[in-house]
């Protein structure tokens, strides 16, 4: 019941032709393509930012661990 068949797609295409006319359909398709590309670029930027944050957190955690080990080694040498 919720599936799209070839008939549904053709019916939608005819409705778009009636509403927008054959001259505006290429412009509409081009605009939709640009919008989809922009959306995908935005998602990629979010992924890159999230990865950068994750990498920075790992480096910070590693630095804290190495500082703790350095302090322990210094205490052991002083004893």
From Swiss-Prot:
Protein's membrane topology: Single-pass membrane protein
Transmembrane segments: 1-21
Region (Disordered): 52-79
Primary location: membrane
GO molecular function: protein transmembrane transporter activity
Biased composition (Polar residues): 56-79
InterPro entries reported for this sequence: TatA/B/E, TatA/E
GO biological process, alphabetically ordered: protein transport by the Tat complex
Pfam families in UniProt: TatA_B_E (PF02416)
Keywords assigned by UniProt, alphabetized: Cell inner membrane, Cell membrane, Membrane, Protein transport, Translocation, Transmembrane, Transmembrane helix, Transport
Role this protein plays: Part of the twin-arginine translocation (Tat) system that transports large folded proteins containing a characteristic twin-arginine motif in their signal peptide across membranes. TatA could form the protein-conducting channel of the Tat system.
Subunit structure: The Tat system comprises two distinct complexes: a TatABC complex, containing multiple copies of TatA, TatB and TatC subunits, and a separate TatA complex, containing only TatA subunits. Substrates initially bind to the TatABC complex, which probably triggers association of the separate TatA complex to form the active translocon.
UniProt name for this protein: Sec-independent protein translocase protein TatA
Organism: Bdellovibrio bacteriovorus (strain ATCC 15356 / DSM 50701 / NCIMB 9529 / HD100)
